[in-house]
UniProtKB/Swiss-Prot annotation:
It is a peripheral membrane protein. It is found in: Cell inner membrane. One of its GO terms (molecular function) is ATP binding. SMART domains: AAA. This is ATP synthase subunit beta. Pfam families: ATP-synt_ab, ATP-synt_ab_N, ATP-synt_VA_C. Its main location: membrane.
Length: 504
């Protein structure tokens, strides 16, 4: 490779090695590109002046309309570092200069971020201009987990207005929730409904991290928040949400770090403003997937099913920061894609250990046309105990699960021999189970535009009392169809009367 001339100002010297490179000896620690492999870039610095691991490097030149930022991931020698690109490396060539910023990737935090949309580096991407400098500070995306003595455990239920969740797998304020499901079973719709139901009623701040999902969905969510008043375009400081996106089209480095950028913004509101923060992530699997891509490019030997060997450590480093402290709380709702509907896949399986509640979406239930397609038997919550939800709620939920479990165990017999071979008691259980199954469905606000059915928010008291009446047999005389897509038992009775008039 020929010597670099005309690019580097000031006194320069040659660095011995595999390339004839001239390195700047000014106050800036400048390195030169020696290798580009898609999202991974090798940079050569003066001997002994390699940047620290996780330091951000910034290009001197402009690529695709902006400066390119790299993150140091490995030290190859005493002068060469291997970096992850946080944007496209199109146009990058050998001998291009990068400056060591001397610090990790940092993002803006503070009230100036409210109502804005950011990328992984904290740059506004909503065409609303730069941030007001007086209203924000800069914070690195890496921070320590709160000390055990500073953490706080809460036992307060977070009411979502969604019957199947509130009854069978309730969420805790300050807890971590996982929405598990395969492709196309309704994870994003469910998380958007939760944002609609919780964020609107929530007095604190909501932070949304779009990790490797569709740009269209991010755009839809932004406009949904504007329409609902969660984001106020006229007076940004009255907004209640911050959006941080690293979408599907972006390189793996951006998708890997965007969750940490969003989490850093959420931590500010918890630790400095002492607020209760809602933290939504869609999708945690893409966080794992991008880590796997980077790991392969860095030359690490893959672990089980091709995932990175550091999967558990990366997941733990992020999840342990999502916690409640004496100053405030972070309640996290995370959508988690399940590859091939296999919950034992290492990516979703690694997430289980960190969660307080798991909501599992089932393709079999979706095929029945029951939405949300939550599996009432696979979903679970640590909050479902007498001490937290009370005796009435606990007993009703356990009876609902018992009836559904019995129905599930009888399905093979029904398929082979038919309903006629069942005992009268089993026939009654099957009839109630089918009513319960349909009553667990509910129209969503965010799906109104597609279904034409107005969405409903069901109070916890209505949910518990309605299911109590069903399991006690008070409404055995109503047809199954009356229980489908209604809010409470009174609506089911009205629907049954309407169906009778129509002769159905």
């Amino acid at each position: 490779m020929s010597s670099l001339t005309g690019k580097v100002k000031g006194r320069a010297r040659k660095i011995k090695g595999d390339a004839d490179i001239r390195i700047n000896e000014s106050t800036e620690n400048v390195g030169l590109v020696i290798r580009v492999m898609t999202a991974v870039v090798d940079i050569k610095f003066p001997s002994g002046k390699v940047p620290k691991i996780l330091n951000a490097l910034e290009s001197k030149e402009i690529y695709n309309g902006k400066k390119l930022v790299l993150e140091v991931s490995q030290h190859i020698s005493d002068s060469i570092v291997r970096c992850i690109a946080l944007d496209s490396t199109d146009g990058l060539s050998r001998n291009d200069e990068f400056i060591d910023t001397g610090a990790p990737i940092s993002v803006p935090v503070g009230r100036a971020t409210l109502g804005r949309v950011f990328d992984v580096l904290g740059n506004p991407i909503d065409n609303c201009g730069p941030l007001t400098k007086s209203d924000y500070s800069i914070k690195p995306i890496y921070s320590e987990v709160p000390k055990l003595t500073d953490q706080k455990v809460t036992t307060e239920i977070l009411v979502t207005g969604i019957k199947v969740i509130d009854l069978l797998a309730p969420y805790l304020k300050g807890g971590k929730v996982g929405l598990f499901g395969g492709a196309g079973v309704g994870k994003t719709v469910l998380i958007m409904e939760l944002i609609h139901n919780i964020a609107k009623a929530h007095k604190g701040v909501s932070v949304f991290a779009g990790v490797g999902e569709r740009t269209r969905e991010g755009n839809d969510l932004y406009h949904e928040m504007i329409e609902s008043g969660v984001i106020n375009l006229e007076e940004k400081d009255k907004s209640q949400a911050v959006l941080v996106y690293g979408q599907m089209n972006e390189p793996p480095g951006a998708r890997l770090r965007v969750a940490l950028s969003a989490l850093t913004m959420a931590e500010y509101f918890r630790d400095v403003e002492n607020q209760d923060v809602l933290f939504f992530v869609d999708n945690i699997f893409r966080f794992t997937q991008s880590g796997s891509e980077i790991s392969a490019l860095l030359g690490r030997i893959p672990s089980a099913v091709g995932y990175q060997p550091t999967l558990a450590a990366e997941m733990g480093a992020m999840q342990e920061r999502i916690t409640s402290t004496n100053r405030g709380s972070i309640t996290s709702v995370q959508a988690i894609y399940v590859p091939a509907d296999d919950l034992t896949d290492p990516a979703p399986a690694t997430s289980f250990a960190h969660l307080d509640s798991t909501t599992v979406l089932s393709r079999q239930i979706a095929e029945l046309g029951i939405y949300p397609a939550v599996d009432p038997l696979d979903s679970a919550s640590q909050a479902l105990s007498i001490d937290i939800v009370g005796e009435k709620h606990y007993e009703v939920s356990k009876e609902v699960q018992r009836i559904l479990q019995t129905y599930k165990s009888l399905q093979d017999i029904i398929a082979i021999l038919g309903m006629e071979e069942l005992s009268e008691e089993d026939k009654l259980i099957v009839a109630r189970a089918r009513k319960i199954q349909r009553f667990l469905s509910q129209p969503f606000h965010v799906a109104e535009v597609f279904t034409g059915t107005p969405g409903v928010f069901v109070s916890l008291e209505d949910t518990v009392s309605s299911f109590k009446d069903i399991v006690e047999g008070k409404y055995d005389h109503l047809p199954e169809a009356a229980f489908y897509m209604v809010s409470n038992i009174n609506e089911a009775v009205k629907k049954a009367e309407l169906l009778q008039k129509e002769g159905k």
